[in-house]
Amino acid sequence: MKERYDFKEIEEKWQARWAAQDLYAVPDYSDRPKYYCLEMFPYPSGKLHMGHVRNYSIGDVVARFKTMQGYHVLHPMGWDAFGLPAENAAIKHGGVHPAEWTLDNIESMRAQLKQLGISYDWNREVATCHPGYYRWTQWLFLQLFHNGLAYKKKAAVNWCPGCATVLANEQVKDGGCERCKAPVEKRELEQWFFKITDYAERLLKDLELLEGWPEKVKIMQENWIGRSEGAEIDFKVEGSDDIITVYTTRPDTVFGVTYMVLAPEHPLVEKLIAGSKQEAEIKEFIRKVRNLREIDRTSTEAEKVGMPTGAHCINPLTGEKVPVLIANYVLMEYGTGCVMGVPAHDQRDFEFARKYGYPIRVVIQPPGVELDPAAMEAAYEEEGFLVNSGPFSGMPNKEAIRAITRHLEEKGRGRFRVTYRLRDWLISRQRYWGAPIPIIYCDRCGTVPVPESDLPVLLPMDVEFKPTGQSPLAECPEFVNAACPSCGGPGKRETDTMDTFMCSSWYYYRYTSPRDNDAPWDRNKVDYWLPVDQYIGGVEHAILHLLYSRFFTKVLYDLKLVSNLEPFSNLLTQGMVLKDGAKMSKSRGNVVSPEDIVARYGADTARLFILFAAPPERDLEWSDQGVEGCYRFLNRVWRLVMPLAGLLKEAPAAVSGKLVGANREMRRVTHSTIKKVTEDISARFNFNTAVSAIMELVNALYQFREIPESDRNPAVLREAVESLLLLLAPFAPHITEELWEATGHRGSIHLQPWPSYDPEAIAEDEITIVVQINGRVRERLLVPAGITPQEMQDRVMKEPRVMRMVEGKKVAKVITVPGKLVNIVIK
């Protein structure tokens, strides 16, 4: 018998055996119900951090649990290997090529994951930087292109000077780059976009299908999509045929418009100011505004600055001339790039009008109150009745919204419109380490897609990839110069690469047939495995990866390439791992290395602590004492089971006969624990309380072990120890394999059936009921478990202490809650 828990020897032994047996390889099909468990794949930085350990440990418990429950489980892993982090890291580390850097990091991180004992099917591993993968990323781009969902246009884009590339709107956080934090600028560039806006309504509506998603994530996506209903209203420019079309959710206030504001980027501005006295001054104002960050223009705290153009437009309902201005707070990207100023009923407009002296005209009055524009200290933005609004005066403003919109439609001066905050997905990147966009430009034929037979368009290795603001591929003539696929003449390849989120928007399909050279996936396999049953990752991906993946799935569904409407049925967003109350980071000096913890305590201890310390969706505070405690617990399990190994091998496999005393209680605790752990994992993912219940079972087993062997039923002991190991196996896979083998079992514990509880075993002989007198607790009594309400009353009324308390009093009534309490009401 091995007296000492040697985690290093045990973990190396079982990791080697699992690999030799290919234990976690998953056949493509099975008669068992399928279960696809997936954690978000990582960027290969080279080092796992504790957030990774938490993410993958959670997924591994789910995968192992479902396997033991009889499911056919797909649990793959791969690498989100393209993108700026790898390129920037390669530049930082002395010009090492991103490919070499990335592949070395993959080797390192794969080894670390295997050290943790995660049950991945490594036969299905993918890396997005491999030509066999990005060939199909390019193929998917072509499907969007051929179906009008990929297009190129000149646009004002988010430019990160730190990363020297364009960012999608979703990659800008508080006016800065989400990766390097540099202030984001606006630039006009020719860029490729995907028409995600074509799917805005479906992306919004189908959130209802995602019953297994956290509400907070659905709300984040709903807000990002930003659906609003309103009206487009046409204001004719005075003395011109030009029209200023404004979008508003408040057409009920159009009679209160006293000025019109255009974004400096609005296409009409140049025409409106041409030849005016202040043209040069306005152009200088526009130049300054365009250099401002978006957040500085839209912040509620930022000063609102405007300039009159000298032009006027005509209110389509009143015929009144309205001055046209430009201002820093209006953006071309939102609505139609213009805002009608209604200072009486919009606080921002109110402040702007007061600052520049524009009239304030009340057109909505609150019930029973008359607003005086001169006395107003703030805009009135609540509901009320229209005034000063022609034929609509007296109408409730909610009703007027519809009535005025209909009137504008009848007159041909406006229309009902639904708009979205969501903008098309910008996928062009002016960096090297990404999938090349499969497009060739020909002077004769224009924009020509690369034929599918010519894929992949390989990323050349001999390229100067340091950021200059230009696409590095543009400096590689061997890549750039290519024959036009249409006419055979000279052509130029697109030199931008694709946003890495393109690669991660479909990887969960590729896992189903990762070595298929003829298609991105086998349709039969995708239809069998998809959607993903359980997806696990950080909430920070709510409006990036998760939204893009939903968009891709809907496009693929429309193209009849998949059968699932949504990619992920259930989503778990785990919390962060904190130390000293803050997120772990090198700058704070509070990083805990998973490698150090595994070397000192073992992978099973690291996993157990991560799973025990907090519910998965909550932030977890790192605790060295907590790690020590989990290590001591595993040592307790070892010291409990190993001395019993010989006895357990000889014990009967099944419990028989009537049990009493300690044997009955031990079996009750065993089956109660099975019930508790099963429910905690399957219904709630409450791994922390599941581990706590297992710890209580160990305590009970230690007590049971101390009773004389002659009084101890060996079958009860065997059942309890086997149950302990089976319940603990998903959390601590190595030690449980070793103890399972030591106690005489053949075959991996991870392929055993999950234990089921016996309802009769957990039924208690006696229960405790509460006795109240006039609602105050006076006594607690042990009574038989199957006692009837009448028997409860009879038992309580015969209790000596109760009899003394009610003696000489009138019992008004007796209230009985079956199995719980008896309340005697006396006067």
From Swiss-Prot:
<dbReference type="InterPro" id="IPR014729">
    <property type="entry name" value="Rossmann-like_a/b/a_fold"/>
</dbReference>
<protein>
    <recommendedName>
        <fullName>Leucine--tRNA ligase</fullName>
        <ecNumber>6.1.1.4</ecNumber>
    </recommendedName>
</protein>
<keyword id="KW-0030">Aminoacyl-tRNA synthetase</keyword>
<keyword id="KW-0067">ATP-binding</keyword>
<keyword id="KW-0963">Cytoplasm</keyword>
<keyword id="KW-0436">Ligase</keyword>
<dbReference type="Pfam" id="PF13603">
    <property type="entry name" value="tRNA-synt_1_2"/>
</dbReference>
<dbReference type="InterPro" id="IPR015413">
    <property type="entry name" value="Methionyl/Leucyl_tRNA_Synth"/>
</dbReference>
<dbReference type="Pfam" id="PF08264">
    <property type="entry name" value="Anticodon_1"/>
</dbReference>
<keyword id="KW-0648">Protein biosynthesis</keyword>
<dbReference type="InterPro" id="IPR002302">
    <property type="entry name" value="Leu-tRNA-ligase"/>
</dbReference>
<feature type="short sequence motif" description="'HIGH' region">
    <location>
        <begin position="42"/>
        <end position="52"/>
    </location>
</feature>
<dbReference type="Pfam" id="PF09334">
    <property type="entry name" value="tRNA-synt_1g"/>
</dbReference>
<dbReference type="InterPro" id="IPR001412">
    <property type="entry name" value="aa-tRNA-synth_I_CS"/>
</dbReference>
<dbReference type="InterPro" id="IPR002300">
    <property type="entry name" value="aa-tRNA-synth_Ia"/>
</dbReference>
<dbReference type="GO" id="GO:0004823">
    <property type="term" value="F:leucine-tRNA ligase activity"/>
</dbReference>
<dbReference type="Pfam" id="PF00133">
    <property type="entry name" value="tRNA-synt_1"/>
</dbReference>
<feature type="short sequence motif" description="'KMSKS' region">
    <location>
        <begin position="583"/>
        <end position="587"/>
    </location>
</feature>
<dbReference type="InterPro" id="IPR009008">
    <property type="entry name" value="Val/Leu/Ile-tRNA-synth_edit"/>
</dbReference>
<dbReference type="InterPro" id="IPR009080">
    <property type="entry name" value="tRNAsynth_Ia_anticodon-bd"/>
</dbReference>
<dbReference type="InterPro" id="IPR013155">
    <property type="entry name" value="M/V/L/I-tRNA-synth_anticd-bd"/>
</dbReference>
<keyword id="KW-0547">Nucleotide-binding</keyword>
<dbReference type="GO" id="GO:0002161">
    <property type="term" value="F:aminoacyl-tRNA deacylase activity"/>
</dbReference>
<comment type="similarity">
    <text>Belongs to the class-I aminoacyl-tRNA synthetase family.</text>
</comment>
<dbReference type="GO" id="GO:0005524">
    <property type="term" value="F:ATP binding"/>
</dbReference>
<dbReference type="InterPro" id="IPR025709">
    <property type="entry name" value="Leu_tRNA-synth_edit"/>
</dbReference>
<dbReference type="GO" id="GO:0006429">
    <property type="term" value="P:leucyl-tRNA aminoacylation"/>
</dbReference>
<feature type="binding site">
    <location>
        <position position="586"/>
    </location>
    <ligand>
        <name>ATP</name>
    </ligand>
</feature>
<dbReference type="GO" id="GO:0005829">
    <property type="term" value="C:cytosol"/>
</dbReference>
